[in-house]
UniProtKB/Swiss-Prot annotation:
PIR1/2/3 repeats: 68-91, 92-109, 110-127, 128-145, 146-163, 164-181, 182-199, 200-217
Gene Ontology process terms (BP): fungal-type cell wall organization
Keyword Signal: yes
Post-translational modification: Covalently linked to beta-1,3-glucan of the inner cell wall layer via an alkali-sensitive ester linkage between the gamma-carboxyl group of glutamic acids, arising from specific glutamines within the PIR1/2/3 repeats, and hydroxyl groups of glucoses of beta-1,3-glucan chains. O-glycosylated. Extensively O-mannosylated.
Pfam families hit by this protein: PIR, PIR1-like_C
Organism, as annotated: Saccharomyces cerevisiae (strain ATCC 204508 / S288c) (Baker's yeast)
PROSITE patterns: PIR_REPEAT_1 (PS00929), PIR_REPEAT_2 (PS50256)
Lineage: Eukaryota, Fungi, Dikarya, Ascomycota, Saccharomycotina
Identification of the protein by name: Cell wall mannoprotein PIR3
Keywords: Cell wall, Cell wall biogenesis/degradation, Cleavage on pair of basic residues, Glycoprotein, Repeat, Secreted, Signal
Length: 325
């Protein structure tokens, strides 16, 4: 895959040609290739949930409960590690962001990616929920939700280690799993929790076989999962291929290949700050690449666009609509 380089000449090193310097137009820091059918403008804010590439092929029959990425204060995005859920995916929780804008993944129950204060995106480690049993003995699994990635205060995005919802059993001994939903769950007057925009359930033909209907995605809105929104959830906007978080910071791949939010402008040395899209499958893409890497850092996973070490695993960043719960 070939990439565009900014029109600057640096005396430091040849590799600096692919990095951002403060005087450069950062919006040109984009891969040369684009994702076929990718959407570069999305009408509403959204989060991301972490989905391991190795397990995505089997997610139709047995999906994960996902937790959305969170964001801590520095802008890092974090994501939790997730376990596979018994039922088809339904509502998703978001990634969080920390204060410095970094995007990280924490060890989670299938929760959303968070963002810490510095803008990094991180994901947390997860746990699995136990199977329940109702009075007739049947075992059932509740509709799974995906938690959003969180963001800490520095802008990093992190994901926590996630838990998977367990199958339940009702009183007659049967083990059952419910269908998943895209929309947020509502509660009616008798106390039951219901979810709208459900995917079609499995049907049974005359010979007794159970078949599942293929899911059809809307080409104009490929995002088919929702998650509860909170203060640490990484909430992003996509316009003309540029990602911004709720503080207006720019989603970029920085010099160490980490995905985080800074600025504007992005931090010096940033490699990419544009060229983002949502794929027809509902995943976040950069250029023509829709896979990223979560790499363990203490209790959280930082997110990168390249494999940087032995503690890294290939993942999809699934786009999720965020709702108030």
């Amino acid at each position: 895959m070939q990439y565009k380089k900014p029109l600057v000449v640096s005396a430091l090193a040849a590799t600096s040609l692919a990095a951002y310097a403060p005087k450069d137009p950062w919006s040109t820091l984009t891969p040369s290739a684009t994702y076929k059918g990718g959407i570069t403008d999305y009408s509403s804010s959204f989060g991301i949930a972490i989905e391991a590439v190795a397990t995505s092929a089997s997610s139709v029959a047995s999906s994960k409960a996902k937790r959305a990425a969170s964001q801590i204060g520095d802008g890092q995005v974090q994501a939790a590690t997730t376990t596979a859920a018994v039922s088809k995916k339904s509502t998703a929780a978001a990634v969080s962001q920390i204060t410095d804008g970094q995007v990280q993944a924490a060890k989670s129950t299938a929760a959303a990616v968070s963002q810490i204060t510095d803008g990094q995106v991180q994901a947390a480690k997860s746990t699995a929920a136990a199977v329940s049993q109702i009075t007739d003995g049947q075992v059932q699994a509740a509709k799974s939700t995906a938690a959003a990635v969180s963001q800490i205060t520095d802008g990093q995005v992190q994901a926590a280690k996630s838990t998977a919802a367990a199958a339940s059993q009702i009183s007659d001994g049967q083990v059952q799993a419910t269908t998943s939903t895209k929309a947020a769950a509502s509660q009616i007057t008798d106390g039951q929790i219901q979810a709208s925009k459900t995917t079609s359930g499995a049907s049974q033909v005359s010979d007794g076989q159970v078949q599942a209907t293929a899911e059809v995605k809307d080409a104009n809105d490929p995002v088919d999962v929702v998650s509860c929104n909170n203060n640490s959830t990484l909430s992003m906007s996509l316009s003309k291929g540029i990602l911004t978080d709720r503080k207006g910071r720019i989603g970029s791949i920085v010099a160490n290949r980490q995905f985080q939010f800074d600025g504007p402008p992005p931090q010096a040395g940033a490699i990419y700050a544009a060229g983002w899209s949502i794929t027809p499958e509902g995943n976040l893409a950069l250029g023509d690449q829709d896979t990223f890497y979560q790499c363990l850092s203490g209790d959280f996973y930082n997110l990168y666009d390249k494999h940087i070490g032995s503690q890294c695993h290939e993942v999809y960043l699934q786009a999720i609509d965020l709702i108030d719960c």
